[in-house]
A protein has these predicted regions:
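Active-site environment of non-heme Fe oxygenases that use a 2-His-1-carboxylate facial triad
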Residues: 1-242
Length: 242
């Protein structure tokens, strides 16, 4: 947990081969975060999906549910099967990309921190939307949250005078999400679970061919407050700074 909080991502190995194994670990840390997709979710190829995650197409790097007032914190994604050709998972540190953008182009960084854009998810059961900036800063000016999801971002509606500059800033950050220097690519194996900070680590996947095998991941979320609370409690009994 300490490494997950520090670096944003860890891999847990040797989970039992059942759908509840990852959830049990998450529940030992804190309460599960319920969303419009339920308390848990299955990432499989579905015939009539309401989310691109439930298809076999490639998913570019993104954070989950930026349309929520407070996006989910830590995601627990347990691989039950990954037999299809393709389907490697992609990860990148959104904080590192933001900090590099700040150093290279302070004006672009400032726009992504100060200007809110619309995010929206809607289907027949929900219509959840919010206006928030891509980058959120803490009291000391440090990056504390990334909201980046091209599929859930709406039409930019800021003042027309800053729109060209904002598009340039957004493209500058997008370019970093496509820069392999920031990326980690791995093909999860059955029995492995990736745990990552959804408000820091962008994730995605390569496309896969469902005719070549089954791909099944099972996931849930635990909010940051629950995660850090458990970490502080554990730190009382071991010599680790929380």
């Amino acid at each position: 947990m300490h490494d997950t909080a520090t670096f944003g991502l860890t891999i847990v190995e040797h989970l039992q081969d059942n759908i509840g194994a990852g959830v049990k670990i998450a529940e030992r840390i804190g309460f599960l975060r319920r969303t419009n997709f339920g308390t848990t979710f299955e990432v499989i190829n579905k015939p009539d999906p309401n989310n691109l995650a439930y298809t076999s197409v490639a998913l570019p790097l993104h954070t989950d549910l930026p349309n929520q007032e407070v996006p989910p914190g830590y995601q627990f994604l347990h691989c039950l099967a990954n037999e299809a050709t393709g389907g490697a998972s992609l990860f990148a540190d959104g904080f590192a990309m933001a900090d590099d953008l700040r150093a290279e182009d302070p004006e672009a960084f400032y726009l992504l921190c100060k200007v809110s854009i619309p995010f929206r998810f809607h289907d027949e059961d929900a219509d959840i939307q919010v206006h928030k900036p891509v980058i959120t800063l803490g009291d000391a000016g440090e990056v504390i949250e990334i909201r980046y999801n091209a599929h859930l971002a709406g039409i930019f509606d800021m003042n027309y005078e800053i729109m060209p500059s904002y598009y340039n800033a957004y493209r500058a950050y997008m370019a970093k999400t496509r820069d392999p220097r920031y990326g980690l690519t791995l093909k999860l194996k059955a029995g492995e679970m990736v745990v990552f900070d959804n408000r820091r680590i962008l994730h995605g996947r390569n496309s896969f061919d469902p005719s070549t095998g089954f791909r099944h991941l099972h996931g849930c979320y635990v909010d940051r407050g629950e995660f850090t609370s458990r970490l502080r409690l554990l730190a009382r009994t071991v010599n680790i700074k929380s």
